[in-house]
């Protein structure tokens, strides 16, 4: 009887495995850890960033450089994939980033400010790897938390 239950559970978990969601989890683990091997495992060699920020290199090296640069500013960066929603060869991911701005971002030195912002990504998966990515980060919140842009409270106090 135990063997039958175990076999049923294993069959159910195998049926629920989704390679599109799995590659999204691997790429989220890259953002969580900064481990370049995870990005190289998740991204196609022909990876295209469809919402490429100014100054970022196209292809696999772009996210590697972005992670390295942002981790220099926020060394304790964590990224949790709070939602992964696969649909065919596409998968939507909501990432929740947290940490403390203790390093340097451009010319700005962090003072330990808490960082807490969201990002949303849409991946196109081909042959088990992310071939294309469209992403949107809440950069306004991030820059306000870093003290690079005034927040709502500081803007309100200037008008009073």
Regions found by a protein language model. Name each.
Residues 89-101:
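A short hydrophobic beta-strand element
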Residues 4, 9-46, 57, 151-160:
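Short, low-complexity N-terminal intrinsically disordered segments enriched in polar/charged residues
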Residues 131-160:
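Low-complexity, intrinsically disordered terminal/linker segments enriched in charged
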Residues 83, 97-99, 121, 137:
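A mature extracytoplasmic/lumenal domain signature
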Residues 36-90:
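A solvent-exposed, acidic/Ser-Thr-rich amphipathic alpha-helical stretch
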Residues 99-127:
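Exposed beta-sheet edge and beta->alpha loop/turn motif
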Residues 84-91, 124-131:
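A short, structured loop/turn motif at beta-sheet edges
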């Amino acid at each position: 009887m135990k063997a039958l239950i175990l076999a049923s559970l294993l069959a159910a978990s195998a049926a629920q495995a989704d390679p599109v969601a799995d590659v999204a989890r691997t790429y989220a683990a890259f953002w969580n850890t900064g481990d370049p091997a995870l990005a190289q495992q998740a991204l196609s060699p022909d990876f295209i960033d469809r919402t490429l920020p100014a100054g970022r290199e196209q292809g696999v090296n772009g996210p590697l450089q972005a992670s390295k640069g942002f981790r220099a500013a926020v060394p304790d960066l964590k990224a949790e994939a709070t939602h992964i929603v696969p649909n065919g060869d596409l998968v939507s991911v909501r990432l929740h980033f947290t940490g403390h701005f203790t390093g340097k971002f451009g010319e700005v030195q962090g003072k330990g400010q808490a960082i807490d912002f969201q990002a949303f990504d849409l991946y196109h998966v081909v042959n088990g790897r992310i071939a294309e990515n469209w992403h949107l980060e809440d950069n306004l919140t991030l820059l306000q938390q870093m003290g690079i842009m005034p927040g709502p409270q500081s803007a309100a106090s200037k008008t009073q």
